[in-house]
């Protein structure tokens, strides 16, 4: 038990440069607290308990802002960074050394029963705000970009970004999709709100030009 707790703490030191001391990690890292609470609730869930595991899960959500269903299966080495808003569904399965950032959802589509949440392979990174929805597999060493919405299977060593998610890299090499597209990095993801505002601004500008033209014609 203590060996596993020690490993949980070491994972944070390995992946978070902001970690300064063991006591800071133990008392101040909500992701670690969520994992510990889940470990307890999951054991009870596997023994056939229903209410108590859900109560523990709800208390953990209140304390940490992270919601992990007691039925979710989580491998060793999970690192949750800035975990507020993370949701992990009942039938989700996480492999070893997975990294999740704030706002990530590993959820279902609302249309399925039974296995309805994603399976995340070993060493996968899911960046801030990404949504992985459905009962498919995200292959080992894959990366999901911030704000992406992934609705279908991701092969190993792929990098996926955008809405809906598209593969832009495989094994670290850019994928040529035959499109005049930019190389979508973390700092170059699409901005739907910005694009919408730009379109509205352009539309208003065109209307103003038409009004000006009509006013000139009426004055003649």
Residue locations for each model-derived region?
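Terminal amphipathic alpha-helical/low-complexity segments used for targeting or macromolecular assembly
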Residues: 1-59, 175-220
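Structural signal for interior beta-strand "rungs" in well-ordered beta-sheet cores
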Residues: 61-168
